[in-house]
Amino acid sequence: MPPLYRRSCITCVQSKRKCDQGLPKCQRCLAKNIHCEYNPRYPNRRRQTTERNVDENVSLVEPIAEEPSRGCQLQRSPARPTSPTHSPHANDIFFNFANDPFNLESIPQDNFLNSTIFEDVVTQQAPNDTERITSDTTAQARVEFAAKKLSVIPKIFSQQGQTMFIHRQLFQDRAPPALQDALSACALYCLKSTENQTLVFRNLEHKRKQLISSIDPLLASKLDLLEALQALVLYQIISLFDGDIRLRAQAEADEPVLLMWAAQLTLRTPQFQPPLGLSNPQSLAGSASMDWGRWLIEESSRRTLITASMLKGVYSFVKLGYDTVPDMRMSFTAQAVLWNSQSEISWRRAYKEKERLEIQVTHWDETIAKAKANDLEELGVLIMVMLKGTGATGEWLGHSQNIRYGLEEAYYGSV
């Protein structure tokens, strides 16, 4: 009679390493992106495809992507080996950003990533796929806007230490290795040139592999898992949309890791409940008795899950012309003053005085009816574009906000 416990996978046995006996792959095999097979005497232990497991257990929300470099192709190629040496973390002083308000408008909307990304990816597809992408101009305009905005996130993070899903005050004092490495990798990537491109890509590859091999999503604390997922999202944005074939192939191979980590974080993250016709914002779940530190963790988690979902959705749409139906049961706090607060005092004041706009995406219209144009920040605008289109969003925001978020071009003549 076979034993009731699961045996270690063959790879871990051969390497004499401890196996966590996970399905469809153990954590070690998943991190190394290799086949994971249990003893064939027990058929029910045999490897299943990672893609099937992820699709059955995880679904995320929607689009993201942007403008990168040229010469991309979509065939997978083996990952370039990286140096076995452990790169030192950046000095803690690297995290000493001033407590200035998060000022997204100060980031120039230049061609940080080359604008040929869409044409480059689309032209690699079969004719039927290309037709599917270009036939729905409404979806195409929304995805392109989200892609162009979200792809500059690594640059924003390197310059300000904060993005629409990473809050500076949550990690600045802790200086976690995952985000510390991501910050240095993003900063180095912003300095990429023809001469140093190989070094920049090797550094990025090393940081990514180091991150994936160091995190067990089942054992990591919620904060460690959050920071690891945030770092991985940054690496994926760069790799998917830079235009380098090797980076893109590796990012596609790492997508199951992203989805697995997101699934684990989802299980630990409370979401807001739908309004149920209640007009008092205090009645929304999670509103009462909240301290700033806890709020930063929970809100960062919700925003990170939405951003990871956008990354998956936009890239799938750009590459394939469609995306699977996303799980819209996500929520976040859309109030810009709350997310951009850099001190507990300013956050508490805004928490009491401002409309908090705790939005469940599936109930967008009920909550957004209470908002003004200047209440929204980048994530809220992106979600609104994905739900309502660039034209409707631009009309709701008004001229000054259109300029602020780069919607003026999309608004005139777009959908």
UniProtKB/Swiss-Prot annotation:
GO cellular component terms, semicolon-separated: nucleus
Superkingdom, according to UniProt?
Answer: Eukaryota
Where is this chain's protein located in or outside the cell? Nucleus
DNA-binding positions are 9-36
**Keyword RNA-binding found:** no
Which SMART domains would you find in this protein's record?
GAL4
Compositional bias per record (Polar residues), positions renumbered to this chain: 72-88
Q: Quick check: keyword Nucleus in the entry?
A: yes
The protein's use is: Griseofulvin is a spirocyclic fungal natural product used in treatment of fungal dermatophytes.
Instruction: Please give one Gene Ontology molecular function term for this protein.
Output: zinc ion binding
What InterPro entries does this protein's entry cite? Zn2-C6_fun-type_DNA-bd_sf, Zn2Cys6_DnaBD
**What job does this protein perform?**
Transcription factor that regulates expression of the gene cluster that mediates the biosynthesis of Griseofulvin, an important antifungal drug that has been in use for a long time for treating dermatophyte infections.
Record-linked PANTHER family: TRANSCRIPTION FACTOR WITH C2H2 AND ZN(2)-CYS(6) DNA BINDING DOMAIN (EUROFUNG), TRANSCRIPTION FACTOR WITH C2H2 AND ZN(2)-CYS(6) DNA BINDING DOMAIN (EUROFUNG)-RELATED-RELATED
- Name listed for the protein in its UniProt record: Transcription factor gsfR2
Q: Which organism is it from?
A: Penicillium aethiopicum
